[in-house]
Curated annotation (Swiss-Prot):
Protein name per Swiss-Prot or TrEMBL: Leucine--tRNA ligase
This protein's encoding gene: leuS
EC number: 6.1.1.4
Originating organism: Campylobacter lari (strain RM2100 / D67 / ATCC BAA-1060)
Family under the similarity heading: Belongs to the class-I aminoacyl-tRNA synthetase family.
Residues at which ATP binds: 582
GO terms assigned for molecular function: aminoacyl-tRNA deacylase activity; ATP binding; leucine-tRNA ligase activity
Cellular location(s): Cytoplasm
InterPro entries: aa-tRNA-synth_I_CS (IPR001412), aa-tRNA-synth_Ia (IPR002300), Leu-tRNA-ligase (IPR002302), Leu_tRNA-synth_edit (IPR025709), M/V/L/I-tRNA-synth_anticd-bd (IPR013155), Methionyl/Leucyl_tRNA_Synth (IPR015413), Rossmann-like_a/b/a_fold (IPR014729), tRNAsynth_Ia_anticodon-bd (IPR009080)
């Protein structure tokens, strides 16, 4: 009988759905596994990256179900976002219609791959019910002071006409559309993620060994904790500006005597005052304003650029005059937006000083080091007044104490991470549940009025925010004073939705209407045991999700400190050496692959071609190879007799039969480690292939039947359709359970021993495992007889089952 992938796969997909095989059980006494792959944006079609992500998660989920665990393996759609609006402009279709049609299509695609997702817990973040509880969280966070409003410089994408968080700007471009990003001052809502900066940093220790070290390092660097000294420089008396002092922050207080200039951020208040009063040359003002329009990343990537501001400050200890500059490498949102620049001991300061011919003052020496820029925190101070000859660490402490005693500074801790701006000037997003009242100011909506949903009668043409122009939708009554007011027209950053979806999935779907999260269910399922997704989410989604977990914990919704126990970051799928994309013309359509080869072949190839964390290069011939392997597996299985297994007397088997059985049980042993620890599915598949090759060399019915009983069990999480089909035919699926290792299979009948003469290896022999030492020595001498001729054996050394060494003279 020929292997018909399409027929077999449709049959089993129907059976699994009808039997609700993928739904989690209500029995909370069972051991649980919560396995979650990052949910997709409903773009309209799944791509091979999705296939890889979900094949990995599905293999884990199926394995643990078979092991008797209660498994939660949900899927949903991150369904708000700008592409829906862009589609509305391009194709004249409403974002809602476009989104939900795409969801329907993609659900069918995912089902056709046999992914074992819970259908009852499927959600879309644009569903009104999801919006309702998200808005509830927003209001609770606002009331707790975790969300606030302010006017600030923001990243603005001219193409998408919306604000972007710092994390959403990549190399000066919008992460979504790739358009240049500019800086713009706007009011907006901010999530106070900085309130949790220290906990977010400290709790990374809990994830060591469970998350990739690269992700932990990226988050640690993004949070950017630094402890140092914050202190003031007096501004030399002048009639130009109102400020009298400039505050700076440094982690290198020991270099204070090496300051040769103070550098201000381009948008520092002193710089803006000089521009407003036109106290700088017009061409300088134009150049500074150009820098102000650049994003922080654009500024840092650009060549060092700066301008003297015709002002001086007074050094707090040496009382020297120090020039005041504006520089593009100083960021306004780190420290106070002012840097004490020490060119002799900081490479960036040195580069700027060399460019503009500024003084370079060495104040640290080590071993007569004459480097122009010495950056190590080791050595002794020089040209530092009363602190000369002190070691760096000692000097840092004593200078800090001196500054504190003068009342002009103190030790502080700074973080690089900034509060998360979540206001977006777009239509297709969750409305921010706030009201603007002329009498009361900003007021939250009443919880009982949620959800605040989007109007559908909007014109989407790419010109501003449609909600801002929808007067009837904006009109409302202030819940505080009862007067006419207006709804907030901004919508939430879509990362707000993806920051808590894992908790929603963990809630009992029977309580979804009443509660954001169901306490009993969430306490059982959380936290996520295995989380699978791309490393590109290391800072954005994963950091926001960790913050949300902690914030919702403190609001009483959740109990755990961290949302994801283990994280697996899968590599991207490439073709012709590049990431798959329509623009490169190297996209592989999963629908075509399923149609031609079947879902199991696609899954087998994707898990065999590379370890999950590595890049996977698409290879048509390897896919063909996966298809042929399944065909051979099918043909061999169909040639076997059905029925129960018979006991096998291992000792009665010949050498080839014992070897085949050993290979099968080695694969079984490996399966436990792969599915539970390493996820190196490629090595497990290779072990199964090796076992099947060994089976082809024998003709023992019971050994072959036992082998398939085990191999179909091992491969079911990877190629489920064909394994169910063959297991039903051969064993009525009784093999889908936890299988035990049989120790007798691993007992060797013989072993190899190296034979050396005077320490030099001369031969290797195979010895029966029951042979005695004198028999082994006799056989050894026989095999190296030519090296013993004319010699006397003075010593015989035998190391059990490893080595014989004959010492002769």
């Amino acid at each position: 009988m020929a292997y018909e992938a399409g027929k077999i796969e449709k049959k089993w997909q129907k059976i699994w759905q009808e039997k609700e095989y993928f739904e989690p059980k209500d029995d909370f006494s069972l051991p649980k596994k919560y396995i979650l792959s990052m949910f997709p944006y409903p773009s309209g079609r799944i791509h091979m990256g999705h296939v890889r992500n979900y094949s990995i998660g599905d293999a884990m989920a199926r394995y643990y179900r078979k092991k008797g665990f209660n498994v939660l393996h949900p899927i949903g759609f991150d369904s708000f976002g700008m592409p829906a609006e862009n589609a509305a402009i391009k194709h004249g279709i409403h974002p809602k219609k476009w989104t939900y049609e795409n969801i329907d299509y993609m659900q069918n695609e995912l089902a056709s791959l046999g992914f074992s997702f819970s259908k009852k817990r499927m959600l879309a973040t644009s569903d009104p019910l999801y919006t309702k509880f998200e808005q509830e969280f927003f209001i609770k966070m606002y009331e707790k002071g975790l969300i606030y409003t302010k006017e600030a410089e923001v990243n603005w994408c001219e193409n998408d006409k919306t604000v972007l968080a710092n994390e959403q700007v990549e190399d000066g471009k919008c992460w979504r559309c790739g358009h240049e990003v500019i800086r713009k001052k706007m009011p907006g809502y901010y999530v106070k993620i900085t309130a949790y900066a220290d906990e977010l940093l400290q709790d990374l220790k809990k994830l060591e060994g469970k998350w990739p070290s690269q992700v932990l390092t990226m988050q640690e660097n993004w949070i950017g904790k630094s402890t140092g000294l914050s202190f003031d420089f007096d501004i030399e008396e002048n009639n130009k500006i109102s400020a009298k002092k400039i505050n700076v922050f440094t982690t290198r207080a020991e270099t204070i005597y090496g300051v040769s200039y103070i550098a201000l951020a381009p948008d520092h208040e002193i710089v803006n005052e000089l521009i407003d009063k036109k106290l700088l040359d017009q061409d300088v003002i134009a150049k500074i304003q150009n820098i102000q329009n650049q994003t922080p990343r654009q500024r840092q990537a650009a060549p060092k650029e700066g301008y003297f501001l015709n002002l001086y400050v007074i050094h707090p200890l040496s009382k020297e005059k120090i020039p005041l500059w504006v520089a593009n490498f100083v960021l306004s949102d780190y420290g106070s937006g002012a840097v004490m620049s020490v060119p002799a001991h900081d490479e960036r300061d040195y580069e700027f000083a060399k460019t503009y011919n500024l003084a370079i003052k060495k104040v640290i020496y080590k071993d007569e080091n004459d480097a122009q820029c010495y950056t190590l925190k080791e050595g002794v101070l020089t040209s530092s007044g009363e602190f000369d000859q002190l070691e760096c660490n000692d000097a840092r402490e004593k200078i800090s104490l001196k500054i504190e005693s003068l009342g002009i500074g103190k030790k502080v801790t700074n973080f690089k991470i900034r509060d998360w701006g979540v206001s977006r000037q777009r239509y297709w997003g969750a409305p921010i549940p706030m009201i603007k009242c002329d009498s009361c100011g900003i007021v939250p909506q009443k919880i009982e009025n949620l959800p605040i949903t989007l109007p559908e009668d909007v014109v989407i043409n790419g010109e501003g925010n449609p909600l801002d122009k929808h007067e009837t939708w904006k009109e409302c009554i202030c819940p505080k004073c009862g007067k006419k007011a207006q709804k907030e027209s901004d919508t939430l950053d879509t990362f707000f939705e993806s920051s808590w979806y894992f908790a929603r999935f963990a809630s009992d779907d029977k309580t979804w209407q009443e509660k954001a999260v169901d306490e009993k269910s969430v306490n059982y399922w959380m936290n996520v045991d295995e989380y699978i997704g791309g490393i590109e989410h290391a800072i954005l989604h994963l950091l926001y999700a960790r913050f949300f977990q902690k914030a919702l914990r403190d609001l009483g919704y959740l109990k755990d400190d961290e949302p994801f126990n283990r994280l697996l970051t899968q590599g991207m799928v490439t073709k012709d050496g590049a990431k798959m994309s329509k623009s490169k013309g190297n996209v592989v359509d999963p629908d075509y692959i399923i149609e031609k080869y079947g879902a199991d072949s696609a899954r087998l190839f994707i898990l065999f071609a590379a370890p999950p964390a590595k890049e996977l290069e698409w290879n048509d011939s390897a896919l063909e190879g996966a298809f042929k392997f399944i065909n051979r597996l099918y043909e061999k299985a169909m040639s076997l007799e059905c029925g129960k297994l018979q006991e096998i007397d291992h000792q009665s088997l010949n050498k080839e039969e014992k070897y085949a059985r050993l290979k099968v049980y080695e694969a079984l042993k490996k399966s436990f480690e792969v599915y539970e620890e390493s996820f190196a599915f490629n090595t497990l598949i290779a072990a199964c292939m090796e076992a099947l090759n060994a089976l082809n060399a024998i003709n023992h019915k019971e050994v072959s039947k036992e082998a398939f009983y085990i191999i179909l069990n091992i491969l079911e999480p990877i190629i489920p359709h064909v394994c169910f089909e063959l297991s039903e035919y051969l064993f009525k699926c009784e093999n889908f359970k936890v299988l035990k290792i049989k120790d007798e299979v691993f007992i060797k009948d013989s072993f190899n021993i190296a034979i050396s003469v005077n320490g030099k290896k001369r031969a290797q022999i195979e010895i029966n495992s029951e042979a005695k030492e004198d028999e082994i020595l006799a056989l050894a001498k026989e095999n190296v007889a030519k090296w013993l001729e004319g010699k006397t054996i003075v010593k015989e050394i035998y190391i059990d089952k490893k080595l014989v060494n004959l010492v002769v003279k």
